[in-house]
Each structure stands twice: as C-alpha cells, then as structure tokens.
Amino acid sequence: MPPRFLPASLPALMFAAVLPLHAQAATPSATPTTTTPAGPRADAVPLIERAKFFGNPNKAGGRISPDGRWLSWVAPRDGVLNLWVAPLNEPAAARALTNERGRPIRNSFWSPDSQTLLYVNDQGGDENFRLYGVDVASGTLKSYTPFDKTVVRVIGISPKVKDRVLVGLNNRDPRFHDVHSLDLASGKLTLVLQNDGYGSFNADRDLNLRLASRPNAAGGSDYFRISENKVEATPMMSVGLEDSQTTAPLGYTSDGKTLYWVDARGRDTAALLAQDVASGQTTVVAQDRRADITDGLFDPQTGRVQGYAVNYLKNEPVALDPALKPDLDFLKREISGEFTITSRTDADDKWLVAVDNVTVPPAVFLYDRKARRLSKLYDTRPELAGAPLVPMQAHEIKTRDGLTMVSYLTVPANFQNPAQPDIQGTPRQAVPMVLLVHGGPWARDGYGYNSTHQWLANRGYAVLSVNFRGSTGFGKSFTNAGDLQWGRKMHDDLLDAVQWAVQRGVAQKDKVAIMGGSYGGYATLAGLAFTPKEFACGVDIVGPSNLFTLLGTIPPYWEAFRKQLYRRVGDPGTPEGQALLKERSPLNFAANIERPLLIGQGANDPRVNVAESDQIVDAMKARNIPVTYIVFPDEGHGFARPVNNIAFNAVTENFLARCLGGRAEGMADTLKASTAQVRHGAEFAPGLKEALTVK
C-alpha cells in the first residue's frame, strides 16, 4: 500500500532524518580524534565511521510487484537514492529507473497493474510533495501532479482497479484537498469531489468514496458517509477529543460490506473492530490491554483481516486467519529478531519480509509461501557486518505520578556488564548518557536497530529513548495525559527518566545531554531553559522555541486540525491559552540557558519555521550566551540529504565529546561536502572553525 502522507488524526511534527533510509555517504573523515571517557578500556572498541551509520543504505524500501514479476527498491545512483527494479527471479539484473540528482527518493509503491512504480518527492524539504510514476518497461517518467505549492495525498489504491488511483490535491484551496481520479496511463486528472472543509477521506476497493472526516468544535472528529460523491450533511458518528488519536478507519473488504477500524471508544487501548456497513453494528476482532492495535494485515484480494500486531515493549505479530498462522509460525521459528511483512503479491504466494536483529542493520528476505522458503535479498548496510554493535533493552520506567513509560536503553559495548542479563542493561559502571527525545510528540519510540543509538553508544555514551506522556501506542489515557503539558509534565517525565538512569547506575549525574528533533528539539530547549542545571548540554534539531509563532505558521493544509492542536498544545485565542503558551515557550526563558547548546535547522521547514531557531539564537546572542547555529538551505523538517545529516552529526559528536567526554571522529572535509551554513558560534563547537577552512 502507498504511504499515508497525512494521517487522519492530528498531524505529528515528526522528525525523521535520523532514519537509515534517509542517509547518504559523505567522504569519510581522516584519522579520528578521540577523547577518552571515564571507564574501563574506553578505546578497546573500534570507532565506527559515522558514514557507515548515516550514509546511503546499500538498498532499502523493497517492494514486490502485485503480479509477482518484479522486485523494486531504492539504492544509490551517483550518490543519491533512486528507484531500481529487477526481475523477481534475477535480482542481480537490476537497473535504475530514475535519475534524481538532488533530493533522495525515500520510498515507492507499485501501481495495481504492476506496470508503474509510483513515488513522491519534494524540493529542498518544502514538503510540497508531487506524485511521479515511472514505467517499468520503458523507463518513461511522468509527473502526475506538476503543481506549485501543492501537496499530494494518495487517498485510494486498489487491486480491483488496475488503471487509476484516487489522489487529493490542494492546488485550488491550500487548506483542503480536493479528490481526483488519476488515470495512470494518460496522467489525466478528473475531479471527483470538491473539498470545502474535510480533513480526510476513505474509499472502498472499487475506489468509490465512502467516508469523510473533519474535526468538530470539541476538538474530536465527525465522520460522514459519502454517496455518489456527495457528503451527507449529518455525521454517522462522532469521536471525542479523548479518542481522536486512537480511533480511525482502516479500510473496506472487497465486497464493501465491512469496514475495519481501530477504535478506543469505550476502552483505553485501541481495539481492531469490524463494522457492518449496512447496519452500523461493530464487532471486536482483537484487542490488547497493554497497547493500541494500530493496523492490521489484510488479504490482498478479499480485504478481510488476517492478522495484526501489538507493539508494547516489542512488536508481536498475531494471526487471526488459520491459513496464515503456519506462515507466521514458520517465520517466528526461522527468524532471529523482529520481522515485518512489507509487501505481498496479489496471489499472496510471495512476501517480502524485513528482519530486524537490533545488533545488525535490517535485512530483507523473499518468502515463498508454497515452498516455505526464506531467501535473503539484501542487507541494508553490509558495511556494518561484523561491527561492534550493541543490544537495546526495553524498560518500564515509572513517572513521579505513577504512569509507566516504555523506554529503550543502549549502553556502550565496553561497558556491558557480564554480571547482569542483557535485558537489564546495567553497565559495569555509570557512563555519560544522551537522553534522545522523539518528535511528534504524538508518536513513539520502538525496539529495534537504531542508527543514532548505535552511533552514540560507539562514542562511549549510554542512550535512553523515553515514551513520555503524550506518546501514542499505549492507550488513550497515556496520550491524553500529555494535553496542555508541553514543558511541564511531559518535561517532568524526561527528568524522571534521567533520575531512573542515575539511580540505577547507568548515567553519571553531571554528564547527561539532551538531544532531539522537532518536539524533541523543543524538549531540548525546554530542558536547558526551564531546568538549566539538569543537563550538561543540548542538541536541538528543528525544534520550536516560541509556541505562539509555531501555531501561527502551521502549513495551510493542517487547517482542518487546528482545533485539535489548540486543545492539545494551547489556544492562542484565549487568555488562559495565551498565558500557558507564554510560560511554555523556551524563547521567553532564553536568559536562563547556561549550558552549551547546538542548534540545527532546515531553511525550508514548513512545520517548524526557520524563525523558530532564529528567534532563540538572536535572544541568546543579545545576552552573550554561547550557542552554535547551523542552517541547511536545501533542507526542511530534518536533514534528508545525507551529506547534510552526516555533516551535522559530525559537529554533534565533537560537541558532545567536549561536553560529555566521549569519543569523536574528526570532521576533516565533511562540512565541505554539505550545504551547512554556520550562522553563529563556530568557536563554541570543537573543530568547527577549522573544518570551515578546509578547501
């Protein structure tokens, strides 16, 4: 299925540039420069070049065509991720289908007739995504949505309708996406429904629009039936704010008689429900008291649910269809680590399965159901084979008011404690630690291979990722506990996690850094401004500093979700909301910052405008408070161009080495390969001034 470019619920201020798929190689640095952290045999573990973590993957994003004839993936072509295709029975005969020179292609999906590979891309991180299609036989590339300042959304794609898809375009009104039928052969767009206020649409497998949703005055969502492309005036159901992040339709069966939902109404964790379309009656298919069910595994032909997964500490697949259970049991026996079924043929005889062993970068296998045979297709990062990667441990950490935060800890290889089982994750002595805060905040951290965890652990740090209140996946009560708690209880949760790590003997109390992107960047600024003595230093990546300007500059196509944002962050239209936003904005407390701060920002960020970083840097400069500020003119909400990601990480690890005493690889000409603009404070980041002089 194609990616969901905008969720039906509240859009997340997600930062994803740290994902391995988004990374691209720069020229490796020269001889590493290292600072030895306190502890036993700190240099006994080889230093892994950061380009091996964040450079281009060998291959990624594998897909199998619906007819089972082709394999596709993204892989480098002249240093940029492009689409490649190969016959299923001859993967070595791969050929590049695209020739992107600047912006990497991050993912793709097949047309239902298996003749076209579809993908989206933007310019310089502006998130004005256009839809492209490349003919597999001829290599002809089509730009299906060549409109300026327009974001495409894929609304419907079905194995029953081979020649077209449904897309949403906001070129008429930037706030709302009109629904069009796109003929894949000709590229013709035909208007299906003009949208005057709805946030999302759902189509059945005949590509008939069946459901529309929009936020209501209470901050929840109303759902409306659609008949003959007309939205009914009265909602068929309403979902309150408390359920809006955990309730959404998933899709219809092929006969159109059943609609599947994830639904938290009447329960805390979202269950998988089947709704009889004619009567409206619902039946609980599956539920788990620990965690939300967020999606299902559906039969490619009938659309009936066959399984689901529960992700609490780790991801646990569950079969519902007896015909599928032997396959999942086989995969569980044969695979060491977690696995995800990423692609299936229409005949459902072959699957692509991604495998994550944590201490090895993910690999992708072809699974032949009839033969019960699993064959490796590729490793995403073969250059890390044999590298000293380390385990990740899942923990449950209590907050001061009794909530449970699922969290993930990685400790350096040379500090692993052989006296403790790996699952405990206690190092032989306390080490410097990086608190890595996820974006969203309506998102979550999970178990698995994590390039940032591995990189920082290799430099000598423990790394802790925390699902603080407001994170999704752990029931609506936990998510809703974050409402109006930016910089308060959400921040208290992070402080509680640090205290847990210190008391457990994981972290040195005076050597804890805070780092993150988007909301994680906000948390970094909040950590240094609101609790200036708690952290040794901070790294903020595309984080908002002023909640007033953040809410005032959201993209126009988020208009339908504005009320939900106000209910969850703060309402700038009320005196109470204004007071809250003022006291939760780190900008207003910039004078309190006394620990080293590094800021990275994309100039074209449509979610967290560059002014968010400009403002706090200016405020710190006016008070002669040291800060290092790096802007990338060809990036948006995160650093998708891997030469830029590597460059910023080069500065980051040298910055952390001075702050925490870990190891660092030298910068050499890494910055030269990027578009980095050091707008302030090169003198405050070790090696940065020297790196800027490299010709």
Report the location of each language-model feature.
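Bacterial N-terminal signal peptides
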Residues: 9-20
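Non-catalytic accessory segments flanking enzyme active sites
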Residues: 60-63, 95, 106, 129, ...
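Cap/lid segment of the alpha/beta-hydrolase catalytic domain
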Residues: 380-513, 517-518, 523, 545, ...
